[in-house]
Amino acid sequence: MAYDVCVYGGNASGVMAACAAAKEGAKVIVVEPSRWLGGMTGGGLMHIDWGREEAVSGSTRPILKQDFNDAQYRKVFAEMLKSAGVTVLFEHRVSAVLKVDGLIRTVDLDFAPFDEYGCPPAKPTKAMARVIKAKVFIDCSYEGDLMARAGVAYAYGREAKSTYDESLAGAQPPMSVYAIDPYVKAGDPQSGLLPGLQSTPVAPVGEADKLTMGYGFRWRFVFKGESLPIEPPANYDP
């Protein structure tokens, strides 16, 4: 499969990049590891993280101003790509990159459908399922998977305040501290930490560390129509 431009990641940025390239006459494909478009925007995280309205411009601003719900955003993004003549390949993720003279020539893709809860599998259903050849590759994934596979240098974690003379860089003190016991058996460090917790110490204020932002899950609530009751679990202890 040969294209002028391959955009890896069908989130909002990937959709806009693909449409911009298509407007210039390029033959474009979007490769999206999940089964939907829009990334976090298509998943329901819209205006709550928009910030200052004047910071958003170009083709993106009129879309965000519509204030769609997540399903509508996914539909809008799909219609945009279809109208632009962009091919979309869902449920495939990068597994290998071929570079020649420092340029990406092809990418190998695994077929790895997400499960019913929207979680990516540890192992693909079919390895090396597709090969994409393109003149230009754009990595719009949140994690930078294509970039990493291509051997591009990158950094993660927090840089020290002194690295770029940024007053608020580096580790920062916690905004809040909650009295929640972190151990499997309350008060017993020997019982181990609860799932998802780690014992890595936070660096001194202003210093660098290799910690990244924790994942958060947000639920979309509706008050009529498709709403379902929220029942407390059997072992819920308020």
What residue ranges belong to the model's regions?
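Beta1/beta-strand and adjacent pyrophosphate-binding region of the FAD-binding site
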Residues: 1-13
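Structural recognition of the beta-strand scaffold that forms the well-ordered cores
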Residues: 6-8, 29-32, 39-41, 47, ...
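Alpha-helix N-cap/helix-initiation motif
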Residues: 10-11, 66, 127-130
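Small-residue (primarily alanine) positions within well-ordered alpha-helices
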Residues: 13, 17-22
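Conserved N-terminal/central alpha/beta ligand/cofactor-binding core
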Residues: 20, 26-27, 31-103, 134, ...
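Flavin (FAD/FMN)-binding glycine-rich loop and adjacent Rossmann-like elements that form
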Residues: 103-106, 111-136, 140-238
